[in-house]
């Protein structure tokens, strides 16, 4: 790939940042030097400011919209003046996809950087091939799954051949096999480019062969640990694990099963398929599954196999193209054998709690507390009871300190916990969750497993679409494996 940039250096001295409307600093007194060509894994608890730091290094913060202190430089320049030196993959890939077709998305950044027209499409094709993008240039971006969006966004980033590669959870939406492929692609890319690499990931062990340094930050503070991976984890592993940092080969303990009440069938899906409008192929091939109380079911499979689509069908939010999804009598008395997609929004809110793959798509209010009150109010709960539930969930999911914050200003992990809390606010009998562990640190991951296990043991049904094998093993009683696209 031509037009390579020299590896970039990062220097932070006493640097800090505070978001609008927040009393607490997201980061403060950050002292950090990353030399050209170094490969650093950036770790920290959920909400520690990892994404904020990457975005700042990329020069994407509006100086008029945030408060900063100290110095942050990329190759001796303010980050906003060095934007052409870096390439950033966002935590939410959909938020950076702006073009209608895949090829145009990859070409967009190259055009903005004035790459000669006769060189653009060769670089586009090479980048798409490098990430094993499963479609051609003309694939509509709106038709991509979350994992396919992640591949496309990475292709667009790599096509720039940046001197500084900033990756925020680059494999979070990918199945384990695809994640391994992408790690290999990134390793080969930084070898070829000689680029400086800073990556945020919770799959720590898998990235250790690629990085030569680990940097750990804390919420509201700065760097608390920094060094070669083996040395750092040997000296600080136990302490870091206690604060929520993921440590290689040390998963949190799974919850023990309690005594279960008798199982009842809540939802039955028979031979269901779904095809999105204007598509020529089914997003979900014919699938049958039943969801029962006191049971957790994991939906797993490769990227693009239809996990998110099946989750929406089971939650009553999509109507099948073929087949049926019907409610059991145990889900709502008097509504047994009715198509779930025919229920009103209020009925669904009372009986089915849903967490989307992109949690910000379900936020409708201006504060975390109001978001938790919305569902109970729609379901007809009295205000005092709704307030009690909201307060309990704020504490249980470590969101109490963010009660007045705007949901759209939360970190990815905090947004995911808020979406889980919102799904639980109406005390539904059925929970359908899409990638609920995205962005969670070791501590909040374990707490989420224990919370969902307790709900299952209390007689609820839990259905999760997930790429997280550890989460599947810790929670699921039954696993449904989906294949590739039909």
Language model region names:
Residues 161, 427:
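Conserved catalytic motifs of ABC-family nucleotide-binding domains
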Residues 221-244, 483-486:
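Conserved beta-strand-loop-alpha-helix hinge in the C-terminal portion
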Residues 18, 61, 71-82, 324-347:
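ABC ATPase NBD Q-loop/coupling interface
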Residues 140-144, 148, 406-410, 414:
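Conserved ABC ATPase signature
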Residues 165-169, 431-435:
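Catalytic Walker B motif of ABC-type/P-loop ATPase nucleotide-binding domains
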Residues 58, 315:
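Helix-to-loop junction immediately C-terminal to a conserved catalytic motif
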Residues 119-136, 384-402:
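Conserved ABC ATPase "signature" region
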Residues 158, 423-424:
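ABC ATPase C-loop
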